[in-house]
């Protein structure tokens, strides 16, 4: 299959699945999401699987590709060094992602009643050891958090506040929340072989669809109007496609500057995958009391599936 065509298919699939994930809960808001323990268990295990996929994507696909790119670039420049450039760039990407998220939270002037940042993670909170509560279930065990009260979390955003914001403010807030998604898209758009593209796509589409579903549930909880829900869903869902398009444009240039940009951006994207895996998925899923070993099994399974897929050419 033509690689450009495959990337376009990835773009469309991610866009459609994230839009559906965001909007379906709004259309069926009468469903009792909080009591659906089976659904939450499935989401939680899927998220753990996605964590394993991201680990394999980062360390079995992206890291070797970035090493190879830097090796070729240094060879062209007749430069010899044993310094771990690929690993360093990945850590730059990791710290950059942490910095962007924490900067947004630091400069927020208020703590409006929920939406919690954890809403952008798709995990469950049943039996959590954490002092923080679920974005879906309040400390009073079942009262709607969106009816009032304040978050134990310092980073919280209000769905109604977001949906009624000016377009520029809405885009800036959602972009800040989804900044790492752009780098995930860049990683997809910059890929040069099919097997790595497939492994990246599987990890991204699983995790980001779950993220979109979590957002959709939160919008349903506060009875967000469909028009406002569509506005939110479109903004969140287009972050990865934007990254894919930019990555494809850079990769198609086929010159020295594009090669350097590709190596740097793929390394930064690798750091983003590390952030998503450890800060958004594992820290959330493995803190819970229920199904811990099962989640570890799905984590290992996700890693194994992608580690095997990387062996094959597609």
From Swiss-Prot:
The keyword Ribonucleoprotein does not apply. GO terms for biological process: zinc ion transmembrane transport. It comes from Xenopus tropicalis (Western clawed frog). This is Zinc transporter ZIP3. It is found in: Cell membrane; Apical cell membrane. Residues 25-41, 106-169, 218-229, 284-292 are cytoplasmic. It catalyses: Zn(2+)(in) = Zn(2+)(out). Transporter for the divalent cation Zn(2+). Mediates the influx of Zn(2+) into cells from extracellular space. It is a multi-pass membrane protein. The gene is slc39a3.
């Amino acid at each position: 299959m033509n690689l450009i065509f495959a990337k376009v298919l990835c773009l469309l699939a991610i866009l459609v699945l994230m839009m559906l994930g965001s909007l379906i809960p709004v259309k069926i808001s009468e469903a009792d999401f909080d009591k659906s323990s089976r659904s939450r268990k499935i989401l939680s295990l899927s998220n753990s699987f996605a964590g394993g996929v991201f680990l394999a994507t980062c360390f079995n696909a992206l890291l070797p590709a970035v090493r190879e790119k830097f090796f070729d670039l240094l060879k062209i420049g007749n430069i010899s060094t044993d310094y771990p450039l690929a690993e360093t760039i990945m850590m730059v990407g990791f710290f950059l992602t942490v910095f962007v998220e924490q900067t947004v939270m630091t400069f927020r002037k208020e703590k409006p009643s929920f939406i919690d940042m954890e809403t952008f993670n798709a995990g469950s909170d049943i039996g959590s050891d954490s002092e923080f509560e679920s974005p879906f279930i309040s400390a009073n065990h079942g009262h709607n958090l969106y009816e009032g009260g304040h978050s134990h979390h310092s980073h919280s955003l209000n769905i109604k506040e977001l949906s009624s914001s000016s377009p520029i403010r809405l885009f800036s807030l959602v972009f800040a929340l989804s900044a790492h998604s752009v780098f995930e898209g860049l990683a997809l758009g910059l890929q040069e072989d099919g097997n790595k593209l497939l492994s990246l796509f599987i990890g991204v589409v699983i995790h980001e669809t779950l993220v979109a579903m979590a957002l959709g549930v939160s919008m349903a909880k506060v009875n967000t109007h469909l028009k406002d829900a569509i506005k939110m869903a479109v903004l969140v869902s287009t972050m990865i496609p934007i990254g894919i398009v930019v990555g494809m444009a850079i990769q198609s240039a086929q010159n020295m500057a594009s090669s350097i940009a590709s190596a740097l951006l793929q390394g930064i994207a690798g750091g983003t995958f590390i952030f998503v895996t450890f800060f958004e998925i594992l820290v959330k899923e493995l803190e819970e009391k229920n199904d811990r070993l099962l989640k570890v099994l799905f984590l290992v399974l996700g890693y194994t599936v992608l580690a095997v897929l990387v062996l094959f050419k597609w």
